[in-house]
Amino acid sequence: MEQLLNKEQLELCRILSMALRNKKIEKLNPDVDYARVIAIAESHKVTSLLYPALAESELPENIWNTVDQKADQTVRQSYRLLMLDRYVINTLQENGIDAILLKGCGTAAWYPVPELRKSGDVDLLLKNEAETLKALQILSEKGFTKEKEQLSQHHMVCESPDHIEIELHTALTEPFDSDKTNQFLMECQKAYFTHRREVNTMGVTFQLTADGYHAFYLLLHMLHHYLRAGFGIKLLCDWVVFWAKQVSDGEKETFLRLVRESGTLGFAQMMTKVCVCYLG
C-alpha cells in the first residue's frame, strides 16, 4: 500500500505514528522535503501533534519554528475551548438540559499531550430538537448568537461572545441513504445518555458517553467525512489513540454490536486497516 503515498506523506505518517506513542524521532530522512511534510500536516491540522516527536530532531530552524508556533497557538486555543466546554455544559445543566461533549477536549484526553490536539469549535450532543432549541435560547441570554443560516440537518450552530462556534447536535450524524440505519441511529442516541463515564482532561472532569458508544460516534463521524465532508488524517489519529488506551472487553463488545447492527462493520475494518498500515 505504501506506493499510494509519496515520500513526504509517508514521512508525515511516520512522525505521527511516533508522536501518538509519545516517542521521539531520532533521525530525519535526508531524501525528504520537510517543508513539504509540514505543509501537508498544516492542511490536515495536525502540525501541533508533531511537536514532541520532533523536539530533539535536527529539523531546519525555519521549519521547526513553524511547528513550535503552531504548537503554542494550539495549546492556547485548547485551554480556551476547555473553559468554554465547561461553561456551556454547566450552564445547560443548571437549566435542566443534559449535554454530552463530543470530540474536542474529550477526545484530546487520549493523546500523550492532550493540549496539542487541534480543535476549533465545541460539539455537544443533546437529547432532541426541543432541548436543542431551549439550549439556544438559554445561551442567547448569556450573549451567544445563533447563526442566521443553519446548513446542517443534524446540528444547530451558535457563536460564543468571543466568536467560537458551538455545534448543538440533535442527532449523531447527518441522515444516511438507508432508512433502516437512520432509525437505528435515532434509537441508539438515547443510550448515549444512559451509558456514561467520567474523563479528566487537562484538569477538568467531564461526563462523556461510555467507551463503546464513544468509539461508535468516532466511526460515524469518520463515515460522515468520508462520504460528504472531506477526510483528514486527524480523524485517523483519533482512532489510533482511542484504541491504544485501555478499553474493557465489555465496551469492545458494545462497539462490535453497534457496528454490526448499524451495517458499518466493513467501514470500521477498513479504517482500522489503514491506521495499522500507515500509523502503526
Report each predicted region and the residues it spans.
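Conserved NTP-donor binding/palm subdomain of two-metal-ion nucleotidyltransferases/polymerases, i.e.
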Residues: 1-120, 126-280
